[in-house]
A protein has these predicted regions:
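Active-site glycine-rich loops that stabilize anionic/oxyanionic intermediates
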Residues: 31-34, 98
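Hydrolases whose catalytic domains are alpha/beta-hydrolase-1, hotdog thioesterase
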Residues: 103-107
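Short beta-strand element of the alpha/beta-hydrolase
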Residues: 23-31
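Catalytic histidine-centered segment of alpha/beta-hydrolase-like enzymes
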Residues: 270-279, 283
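Flexible "cap/lid" loop of the alpha/beta hydrolase fold
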Residues: 109, 116-159
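Conserved alpha/beta-hydrolase catalytic His-Asp/Glu region
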Residues: 130, 150-223
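Conserved serine/cysteine hydrolase catalytic core
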Residues: 188-257, 263-266
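Active-site loop/oxyanion-hole signature of alpha/beta-hydrolase fold enzymes
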Residues: 7, 15-19, 40, 50-95, ...
């Protein structure tokens, strides 16, 4: 894996009452185009139940972290280790979704002594296939276009309506059921739009990711990440949605080569974003694993 200059990551911290400072803290790592906010109150619940300090970070080119032209999934490993060094974290528990899961996987394999346990949400150990990268590229592009069409000063309902209508009108029919669409688009009328945004000085909404850098990286799937290598023998939990594109039967042999002590939990009624679709079931699975 090539070496990259790390960037400063934004984060939020949860310190539970009665925090046990002798226990390694927990770090939550989001997926592509998400942010630290999209873990909702799960970091608080897990921190309070385990009496461990918890962090939720924004990856580079996401949320409030530094934006840079350099971006691929390998960069995130260097950024995570830099963050741990800056915060004085010798060892941590990693709970990570999708792209963040790949960060956790590669970190655990690279420096297993710095990872006590890991929870991987709805991603395997293999690089994403080109077909999936194409889907993600389409969705990032359409989402960004939709955000740009939102009128300045619009309320939340107008924002949601404008973006979803633009995507719906322009999304190829064969992509309507893909995991990225499922991840971001509301499933019910009162659902929140799972897209990180901010309001600029002109009142216009902006995608809270570095769109040019991410789209440029997605143009070259073969260089998006190097293949994971090594063995992590400590406890590992792979959580997946039973409605997602993750197929345990086909992925388990690849996972077990690198993570021989991996356990698997499938969550009913969950798509790619298990922690958003079924937060109670996700949190219960995480706590059971951490408290074993």
């Amino acid at each position: 894996m090539a070496s990259f200059a790390p960037v400063k990551l934004a984060f939020r911290t949860v310190v539970p009452d009665g925090c046990d400072e002798t226990k390694p803290p927990i770090i939550f790592i989001h997926g592509l185009t998400a942010s630290k906010e999209y873990w909702m109150d799960i970091p608080e619940i897990v921190a309070n139940a385990t009496k461990r300090k918890a962090y939720a970070i924004d990856s580079r080119n996401h949320g409030d972290s530094e934006f840079t032209d350099e971006f691929n999934f390998d960069c995130n490993v260097e950024d995570l280790l830099h963050f741990m060094d800056k915060e004085g974290i010798e060892k941590a528990v990693l709970i990570a979704h999708s792209m963040g899961g790949l960060t956790a996987i590669k970190t655990a394999l690279k420096v297993p002594e710095r990872v006590e346990k890991i929870v991987i949400e709805d991603v395997s150990v293999r690089p994403p296939p080109k077909e999936m990268i194409g889907v993600i590229t389409t969705m990032v592009t359409l989402t960004n276009e939709g955000i740009q069409q939102v009128p300045a000063g619009a309320d939340k309902e107008t924002v949601k309506k404008t973006i979803t209508e633009h995507i719906g009108k322009n999304l190829p029919p064969e992509l309507l059921s893909n995991y990225f669409f499922q991840k971001n688009m509301p499933k019910k009328k009162d659902d929140e739009l799972r897209i990180p945004m901010k309001v600029g000085d002109d009142g216009k909404y902006e995608f809270k990711i570095n769109v040019p850098a991410i789209l440029n990286a997605l143009k070259s799937p073969e260089t998006l990440m190097s293949a994971p290598a090594g063995v992590y023998e400590k406890p590992t939990l792979f959580i997946h949605g039973l409605l997602s594109h993750f197929k345990k039967d086909s992925e388990e042999p690849h996972i077990m080569k690198l993570f021989p002590n991996a356990n698997f939990v499938g969550i009913e009624n969950a798509t790619h974003t298990v922690h958003n679709d079924c937060p109670k079931e996700f949190t219960e699975a995480v706590l059971k694993f951490l408290q074993e």
